[in-house]
């Protein structure tokens, strides 16, 4: 039987030790556990391609920052210790609709987003309550506030 002191820590134990400024068995890994540790959807699509992962799809849960929802296969591949409890809308297809990232890669975005092409200036505009709220100009990678 293995000595419990030499068993690897669980993700929870590892993160708790790090927060308490104690030395864990390795550094905790976070990839998309919260918005500030997220990964841009275009980078995520390229990461999946580099790893040879063809299953699943790129889903953008934060349009402004273009953040991707990191799939379980990628989390597992990197031994990620921190996961998000709030990013996902779920797997149901009716919750997502197709779109293309600025580099042309197919993705899915939340179905409830009122996203319209800007016929005058090019790019895209996100509308809420009849007002243009965020805009992605041609050549840009992110949405910015449309109303200041």
Regions found by a protein language model. Give the residues of each.
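Catalytic cores of TIM-barrel enzymes
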Residues: 1-148
């Amino acid at each position: 039987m293995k000595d419990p002191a030499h068993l690897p820590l669980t993700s929870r134990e590892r993160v708790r030790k790090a927060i308490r400024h104690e030395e864990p068995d390795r550094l905790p890994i976070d990839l998309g556990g919260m918005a500030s540790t997220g990964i841009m959807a275009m980078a995520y699509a390229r990461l999946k391609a580099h790893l040879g992962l063809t299953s699943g799809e790129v889903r953008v849960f934060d349009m402004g920052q273009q953040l991707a929802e990191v799939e379980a296969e990628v989390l597992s591949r990197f031994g990620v210790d921190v996961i998000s409890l709030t990013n996902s809308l779920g797997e149901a297809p009716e919750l997502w609709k197709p779109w293309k990232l600025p580099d042309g890669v197919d993705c899915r975005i939340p179905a409830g987003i009122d996203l319209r092409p800007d016929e005058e200036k090019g790019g895209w505009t996100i509308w809420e309550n009849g007002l243009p709220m965020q805009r992605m100009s041609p050549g840009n990678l992110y949405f910015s506030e449309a109303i200041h």
